[in-house]
Amino acid sequence: MSSAIERKSLDPADEPVDEVLQIPPSLLTCGGCQQSIGDRYFLKAIDQYWHEDCLSCDLCGCRLGEVGRRLYYKLGRKLCRRDYLRLFGQDGLCASCDNRIRAYEMTMRVKDKVYHLECFKCAACQKHFCVGDRYLLINSDIVCEQDIYEWTKLSEMM
């Protein structure tokens, strides 16, 4: 389950910080270190307030409050995306090399086939594809536009 992280600012003009609970900024307690939050900037996640340095992944320790990071909270653990996928994601097999694809790896998907990025290349000339390149999927083989005729002819001979 992914959770939103809200960045808050502690400014005397912004009292109270939490409109629902009517908590004044001086009474905020960090969900990590249990100390009072006196910093100007702090975070709100999992229904708690946090110092920016205290909200971190329970496994690798990376900071979860950084811009662009997502917090995953499952079974009482705060996790970064990589660790969440490592623990709860599903692995698969590459349609080209038949080796394991870990849940956190970047992949290319064509119909029901999944490929490692390094395996997503023309079966004939071994050229890696770029965005916008045209190709044809023949069985589990990916063939670039330039090699389609030769590859089809070769396949018919076998």
From Swiss-Prot:
PROSITE patterns named in the record: LIM_DOMAIN_1, LIM_DOMAIN_2
Up-regulation conditions: By bmp-signaling. Inhibition by fgf regulates the timing of hematopoiesis.
GO biological process, one term: erythrocyte differentiation
UniProtKB keywords: Developmental protein, LIM domain, Metal-binding, Nucleus, Repeat, Zinc
Annotated ranges, domain LIM zinc-binding: 28-90, 92-154
Keyword Transit peptide: no
One term under GO cellular component: nucleus
A Pfam family that the UniProt record links to this protein: LIM
Main location: nucleus
Tissue specificity: Expression becomes restricted to the ventral blood island (VBI) as the embryo develops. In late neurula and early tailbud embryos, also expressed in the dorsal lateral plate (DLP), the site of definitive hematopoiesis in the tadpole. Expression in the DLP diminishes during tailbud stages. Expressed in circulating blood cells of tadpoles. Also expressed in non-hematopoietic sites, including the tailbud region and the central nervous system of early neurula embryos.
Subcellular location field: Nucleus
GO MF annotation: an example: metal ion binding
Function: Transcription factor that acts synergistically with tal1/scl and gata1 to specify embryonic dorsal mesoderm to a hematopoietic fate. Induces globin gene expression together with fgf.
Protein name: Rhombotin-2
